[in-house]
Amino acid sequence: MSKIFVNPSAIRAGLADLEMAEETVDLINKNIEDNQAHLQGEPIEVDNLPEDMRRLHLDDEKPSGLGGMAKAGEVKYREDFQMDEGEDPNLLFQSYLDNVGVQIVRQMRSGERFLKIWSQTVEEIISYVTVNFPNPPGRSSEDKSTQTTGRELKKETTSASYQRDSQSSKARMAAQTASGPPALEWSATNEEDDLSVEAEIAHQIAESFSKKHKFPSRSSGIFLYNFEQLKMNLDDIVKEAKNVPGVTRLAHDGSKLPLRCVLGWVGLANSKKFQLLVEPDKLNKIMQDDLNRYTSS
């Protein structure tokens, strides 16, 4: 059963996005309270009205804040999700976030990458907030500080959207490069991708850390060797393994790595004992054969 490694930087980035989402919700709640400030009179009892009378809508040429919100998204919102009169939108949003968390856990257990799951989840949360908490039209009595806050929030949202589009474009370019000729080596486009590649390499090496591989010896025989005998830190092994042609590309795609080739490469570069035991020419041929077999499959 494969293990899932989540990078601390990815978790911190996710927590930062959640904090931004909470701040957005607080601002939305404040706008909703401001828009409902005029609803301080006695409520109209409609229990005794005929059933069809309750469905009537009054058209006013002077739209209020609440009426503007209703015109912007009421029709589609009622078709997709009918909210009861007594339900609090904040509670519904909290319930939605709980369901999102459960879905993230399920997707991670199924083997999907955390960064891919999180980017999709952020887009879904933004869409939910946009549909269910639309921005009300401006009022003449609106406070200037609220207007300034709204403009700053809009600029931040636009900037974040532009950054996401830019990163997606870079990721697509990297994928096209990776799918080109085998001689072209995939390179990480940002820190998150690079960390995910390192995590995949470390995961596969750690699973076979004590597994012995056969290597040609100088005495025309063979000898057994494993990663544990290198006496190296796993991070240093991963750093050296990334220099093996084709390994970062295979790790990015989630494919199986040629671990014997990686071990031979790291051993030649860092272990004097391995250098004394192995026959270099035969090892080079074995490593090249392993690379060709894994990159062509």
UniProtKB/Swiss-Prot annotation:
Residues 138-172 are annotated as: DYNLL1 and DYNLL2 binding. InterPro entries: PP_M1-like, PP_M1_C, RABV_P-like_C. It comes from the Viruses. Keywords: Chaperone, Cytoplasmic inwards viral transport, Host cytoplasm, Host nucleus, Host-virus interaction, Inhibition of host innate immune response by virus, Inhibition of host interferon signaling pathway by virus, Inhibition of host STAT1 by virus, Inhibition of host STAT2 by virus, Inhibition of host TBK1 by virus, Inhibition of host TLR pathway by virus, Interferon antiviral system evasion, Microtubular inwards viral transport, Phosphoprotein, Viral immunoevasion, Viral RNA replication, Virion, Virus entry into host cell. The modification Phosphoserine is found at residues 64, 210, 271. A motif (Nuclear export signal) lies at residues 49-58. Residues 140-157 have a biased composition (Basic and acidic residues). Phosphorylated by host PKC and by an unknown kinase. GO terms for cellular component: host cell; host cell cytoplasm; host cell nucleus; virion component. Disulfide bonds: none annotated. Gene3D superfamilies: 6.10.140.1560, Phosphoprotein, C-terminal domain. GO terms for biological process: microtubule-dependent intracellular transport of viral material towards nucleus; symbiont entry into host cell; symbiont-mediated suppression of host cytoplasmic pattern recognition receptor signaling pathway via inhibition of TBK1 activity; symbiont-mediated suppression of host JAK-STAT cascade via inhibition of STAT1 activity; symbiont-mediated suppression of host JAK-STAT cascade via inhibition of STAT2 activity; symbiont-mediated suppression of host toll-like receptor signaling pathway; symbiont-mediated suppression of host type I interferon-mediated signaling pathway; viral transcription. It holds the Pfam family PP_M1. GO terms for molecular function: RNA-directed RNA polymerase activity. A motif (Nuclear localization signal) lies at residues 211-214. Residues 131-188 are annotated as: Disordered. Belongs to the lyssavirus protein P family. Non catalytic polymerase cofactor and regulatory protein that plays a role in viral transcription and replication. Stabilizes the RNA polymerase L to the N-RNA template and binds the soluble protein N, preventing it from encapsidating non-genomic RNA. Also inhibits host IFN-alpha and IFN-beta signaling by binding and retaining phosphorylated STAT1 in the cytoplasm or by inhibiting the DNA binding of STAT1 in the nucleus. Might be involved, through interaction with host dynein, in intracellular microtubule-dependent virus transport of incoming virus from the synapse toward the cell body. This is Phosphoprotein. The gene is P.
